[in-house]
Amino acid sequence: MNDNLDLFSGAAPAAPESGAAPDKVLAKVQALRAQLNQWAHEYYVLDTPTVPDGEYDRVFQQLQALEGAYPELVTPDSPTQRVIGAVLDGLMPVRHAVPMLSIRTETDNEATGAEAFDARIRKELELAEGAPPVEYVAEPKFDGLAMNLRYENGRLVQATTRGDGEVGEDVTHNIRTIRKIPLSLPEGKGVPPVVEVRGEVYMGRADFVKLNERQQAAGGKSFANPRNAAAGSVRQLDSGIAAQRPLSFFAYGLGEITPAAQGGPDFVTHYAMLQTLRDWGFPVAPQVCIAKGAAELVAFHQRMGAERATLPYEIDGVVYKVNSLAQQRQLGFVSREPRWAVAHKYPAEEMPTRMEGIDIQVGRTGKLTPVARLAPVAVGGVIVTNATLHNLFEIRKKRVRTGDTVVVRRAGDVIPEVVGRVPGDRPAYVPNFRMPAACPICGSAVARPKGEANHRCTGGLFCPAQRKEAILHFAARRAMDIEGLGDKLVDQLVDGHVVRTLPDLYRLGLVALASLDRMAEKSAQNVLDALEKSKKTTLSRFLFGLGIRQVGESTAKDLARHFGQLDAIMDASVEQLLQVRDVGPIVAESIHTFFAQPHNREVVEQLRACGVHWEEGAAREQTAQPLAGMTVVLTGTLPTLGRDQAKEMLEAAGAKVSGSVSKKTSYVVAGAEAGSKLAKAEELGVTVLDEAGMLALLAGGDR
């Protein structure tokens, strides 16, 4: 290190005098930060360290000491602030300034799929047969977590997950801990006042293995794959935990950015934008390259497929993007997906291994699922020891028995499944597998309902396996939304016989909760507060939370709108239930059977007695349905209403909310960044409304 950076050598700084820090100290702090940022960039991004770790640590400690002596000099982008030890109560939702749209994934996963994409692009651009090849940027498709990094005046101010594309979660406290992500951008390199950099947070293969080794040594839970490890780390409330996880980042695009007319960069190509991101200190995948025409895209697909298993991080495919930004604008979007880009996934990876046995898992609805217990095998960089066999009929169809050598596939590169048996000798005297007659968890009888392939435990909420899953489902965000009631807490509550039924949740006390492992008084009070808050809900959320088989979120809303009151639903006949939109015989029978059980009715009444309530409404037949029979499409970002909120309002008025525009569409409600749906509506002559127009329509205004 240069001598002029040594403000003091090993000794603590002198006690500061009152008032602002001296100019000499400020200059030295800025110099130390610049040097540390440069070394960190060389080490974490360029992989070419120029100083020993000890030298970096020594300068880092000098900066820490100076900031400790002069706390007014501490800034959020200082290298010392990557880990601030903050523990949040929850992740805050953030609406994206520019929606994080997804790229269409082709079902054709062969390299030749690139030829079809290129042909489609040339047709859309109306290029003649002899015209020069289209220039693309070819990129690996990372298997991680999409992230939006917002910088204002060169400083990282917010990091947000993709979420549903419109609204994500603020995870800035954790993203600051990732060394490959710069906290500040360099001066003098054309960084605009506002820029959002988008990319993928991931965990390398070797880092993933080491993390699981540490987890196992500490008695913790291992992660199934690097993507789950990365996603779980990013969504931690405690940044100290995230800081211990070896996360990395690759940049691949932009969100909101200061326009060129206001001093922002004027990019001509996607590749030039990526090169600029490199110059600003962001890591960009080294495999990214320009490909001219279909032949070079095919070659890239084949090259990445051959290198895939040896890469230090997981990829599950490749992405092709038209390089010219002018051509991107010309191509536009369709169904909120860019026409100018496509993803091609590689086929699922398969490996042989020995099936050592078949275990039974009992799910939330009582379904018994046979699971193959396997000799450990690496499939796509993940050690697989279990794989689903789905049901008895699948086992018979695949003709697998204990002791067989079977082929295991990671379907979608995530879920392991047994594909089939490898022909050859099998051990003698191995009988065919039979489903148990009694539930392995509670001992209740097992039955297979008529017309179904699945066997089920008849124990209901009395079965601990169903009890845990039923409680977790009841507490889920889209059901009763009981924050803090997660897997580990539910395990303790059920295993400790503290909670046996759903109403028991609302009878919990502070002393009982606080006495559980890893549950301090403050955490216990937070759970109690969340339970109290959840008592005021909606009929559709309550119905969904009960976990009735075949009743998802949409069906629960339809039931609530049709009947208006819970008692009417509970007393409805199968014939009456069949009058509800999208409810068929199987769903109607499931609902009727659920409420015919005395113990289920008792649970409902006890929940009401505990204070769970909602606003009862009139039945649909008695309620005005101004938009009955109409189809409405939502597109873009509305000024004050979220997409889910607008959808609920429209559906409550009898409209069907569709995801695509056609001649049968009655209205298109358009907000900012409306895209191709708006263009399609104008082309077909469909009436377009803004948010105010939609509200007027709902209020009974002119159609």
Swiss-Prot record:
Residues 1-20 are annotated as: Disordered. The keyword NADP does not apply. It catalyses: NAD(+) + (deoxyribonucleotide)n-3'-hydroxyl + 5'-phospho-(deoxyribonucleotide)m = (deoxyribonucleotide)n+m + AMP + beta-nicotinamide D-nucleotide. Zn(2+) binds at C439, C442, C457, C463. GO terms for molecular function: DNA binding; DNA ligase (NAD+) activity; metal ion binding. Residues 622-703 form the BRCT domain. Disulfide bonds: none annotated. NAD(+) binds at D53, G54, E55, Y56, D57, S102, I103, E139, R162, E200, K321, K345. DNA ligase that catalyzes the formation of phosphodiester linkages between 5'-phosphoryl and 3'-hydroxyl groups in double-stranded DNA using NAD as a coenzyme and as the energy source for the reaction. It is essential for DNA replication and repair of damaged DNA. This is DNA ligase. It comes from Delftia acidovorans (strain DSM 14801 / SPH-1). The lineage of its organism: Bacteria, Pseudomonadati, Pseudomonadota, Betaproteobacteria, Burkholderiales.
